[in-house]
Structures are given as C-alpha cells and as structure tokens.
Amino acid sequence: MTLQPYIFQDEEDRIDSITYSVQAPELPFELHEARFIYGKSKNLSIYVDESGNTGGAVNSNSLWYIICLVFFENEDISEYEDELEYKFSMLGHPDHCFHTSPLIHGENCYANDSINVRRKIMRNFMSFLRQLPAKHIEICIEKKNLTEEKIYESLIKQFIDFIENNLQYFSRYSNITFYYDNGQNIVLKILEETVKDIIPEATIEYETPKHSRLLQIADLICSLKWLGIKSRTVGLSYKEEYFFMDDRHLKRDFLRIVEKKEFKQN
C-alpha cells in the first residue's frame, strides 16, 4: 500500500468528509458485540509514533500529520539488537537511542558526526528493520487549514476504521499492548478514547524510545513515510536531499524497504 494523503478539493468536501465529533464517537453496535478468541498464547505489541504537529503555522515542514503503528509479536530479537549495538559502538555511539530527524539534519548527538558516519548509522538501522518480524500501518492527513479539532476528528475516524476492518487479526492475540511515549496529547487521546472500547484485551503503556528499539523503528518508519510524501509534493529540504543524495536514492534504498514491511489489511 502506497501512502497518499487525502487532499480536500474544496470546503464542502472537507466538511462532508469529517463525520466524527470531537468527543470519541459512539462505536457501532457490532463492535461492542465483537467476540475475541481467548486462550491464545500470542502477545501483540503495537508501537506508536507520530510525525508533524497539530497546531502552529502551516509550512512545507508541517503540511501533513502521520501516525505510525508498528505490530510486533514479541519474538526474540536479542541477536539482532546485539549486532546493532556492536555496529553503533564501532561508529562512536554506544548505548545509542536512534532518532531519525536529528540524524538526517546532523543535530543533537549527531552534530559532530560526518555525513558518512551518519549515513552508516542509518544503513545499520535499516538493516535492523529488514531483519525484524514486524509490520506497520500509517494514518495520514493533509492539514491544510484544518483546526486541531478537525485534525483529531479525521485521525480518530481513520484509526477506528482500521481496527474495525481488522478485528479478525486482533482476535488472534490474548494480550495486546500499545506503547507510546506520550509525545503528543492528540495521539494519547485517540488511544485512550478508542482502544479499550474496541479491543477489551488491550492496554496502553508509557515507554521511552531510549529503552525501546521498536519505538525507534516506529520513529524511523514515520519519518521516512513523511519524507516520501514531501519529496513527491513540495520537495526535500537542502539537508534532507544532501543526506539521501536525491529522491531516487530515498525511494530505492529506504522507502522500498519500508513498503515491504507494510501491514496487509483485510
């Protein structure tokens, strides 16, 4: 599935496309009556991250808002994590918490790293992504002149639609946990006001990216998806294009890998 932001054609289209109130919508009867299969031994972890913001002036860096969900069945990945830690240590970043945007722009802990070192760090983390038995899905909207309330309405509608359309998938698991770093209130609000009503087995837990490679993966995927949309519309910034060299390399070496990990919806 190729991620495409929905572009409203006019104000009437914008209004007609938003049908959920600011309060969490009342769930359809069939969702309340959904029966999940108990006694399953599998556990599902869902790691959540976002790209963009819901307020402030709209410019080329804030035209879209994306929420990424990474699905992971809690398999043993310690071998992959140990290999990644060794590679990061060899590049001068032991116990490293990967963060995509500062890496691309050479900021924060990457400020003193050369472009070659930063690209190697990215390649190592992309290799880690390829090895992971994980899938992802994104919820994306084009902000345009939407208020924060309208952004919330659109996001929560898409979130509920996704879960409703994949109830059979979620029924495979006896325990489902959503992990989020509480980075933005709008995402936390969507999780808190919908998850328990639709999936009774689910819980929401706070986690920091520093202690979770899967949250760092969610950050990577979310950022790359956002850059993919940006490259097709307004174009990459100078630093972004310098890091990836050009749009072709971004698509070939990064976005294609991400696309292979996409969650296949029912």
Q: Each PLM stretch: what is its role?
A:
Residues 2-266:
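Phosphate-ester processing/binding pockets and catalytic centers
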